[in-house]
């Protein structure tokens, strides 16, 4: 007989849970244990049918202040952390390590960590479901060790997170094995296609209507229509905002680099080093040497604060 487990909510000691976060549609879908089990089976090649085998752990903490985009759960004495991301970041392994530490702290809160008896903890597995608009491979592994500032022959601590691209057209085998992932990818793809022709509000409304008619996320969208529309608009606006911030940062960096380059050429010209200027234009390595030669003065130009940041 299968023993039913209660949902376990864990909090970091001394921390007030943040109840102002917004959830993503993806995570709202996986709050349904049946759908979460469907995703788990597809990823692991298993055939579990009892959703109560899952023991969901939720943790509200400062790492995710704006958007609730994760779900963690126990099954077969293993801890799984699923995270949804619409923007790629190489820093995800570190964020997951911090999150894992909080989860373990909650799980062992009543255990004697100074005692002689071994305190057992579930081994973790990390999966990132990516559906951003930046092109990424179907699957890739992100490692904590890639973030280390110093090289080591062997790493004393590492963490691997597998990132899966769940955009329409990616990971066809996974999509075939998991209906809920395919439906989510289809819904998201329609919103993005339609927003090219109309406002985000109209694009979401059209996608919701079509998906309900065609049986795509039908039950969820019927029951949570207003919430789904609000979340879709919020996710789109947040993704657009982050994309604009990256573009503005890139443009600011490009302008700073051009200022430094102009300053270098001006200094070379004052020293009558015209040949060095001509060579640097066609030789990136030589340009790098010159930038190092005039490093301090060029660096001051490159990091000149923008207006309002002084």
Regions found by a protein language model. Give the residues of each.
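Elongated, amphipathic alpha-helical interaction scaffolds
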Residues: 1-310
């Amino acid at each position: 007989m299968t023993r039913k487990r209660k949902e376990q909510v864990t909090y970091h000691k001394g921390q007030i849970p943040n109840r102002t976060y917004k959830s993503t549609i993806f995570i709202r879908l996986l709050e349904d244990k049946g759908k979460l089990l469907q995703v788990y089976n597809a990823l692991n090649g298993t055939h579990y049918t009892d959703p109560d085998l899952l023991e969901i752990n939720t943790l509200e903490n400062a790492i995710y202040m704006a958007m609730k985009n994760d779900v963690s759960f126990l099954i077969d004495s293993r801890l799984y952390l699923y995270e949804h991301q619409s923007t790629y970041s190489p820093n995800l392994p570190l964020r997951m390590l911090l999150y894992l530490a909080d989860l373990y702290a909650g799980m062992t809160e009543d255990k004697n960590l100074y005692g002689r008896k071994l305190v057992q903890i579930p081994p973790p597995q990390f999966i990132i479901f990516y559906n951003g608009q930046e092109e990424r491979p179907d699957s890739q592994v992100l490692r904590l060790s890639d973030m280390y500032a110093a090289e080591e022959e062997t790493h004393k601590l590492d963490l691997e997170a597998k990132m899966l691209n769940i955009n329409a057209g990616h990971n066809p085998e996974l999509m075939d094995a998991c209906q809920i992932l395919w439906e989510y990818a289809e819904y998201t793809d329609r919103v993005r296609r339609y927003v090219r022709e109309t406002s985000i509000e109209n694009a979401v409304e059209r996608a919701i209507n079509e998906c309900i008619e065609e049986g795509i996320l039908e039950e969820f969208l019927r029951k949570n229509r207003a919430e789904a529309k609000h979340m879709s608009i919020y996710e789109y606006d947040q993704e657009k905002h982050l994309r604009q911030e990256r573009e503005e940062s890139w443009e600011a960096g490009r302008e700073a680099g051009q200022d430094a380059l102009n300053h270098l050429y001006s200094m070379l010209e004052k020293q009558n080093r015209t040949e060095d200027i001509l060579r640097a234009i066609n030789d990136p390595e030589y340009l790098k040497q010159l930038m190092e030669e005039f490093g301090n003065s060029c660096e001051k130009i490159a990091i000149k604060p923008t207006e309002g940041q002084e």
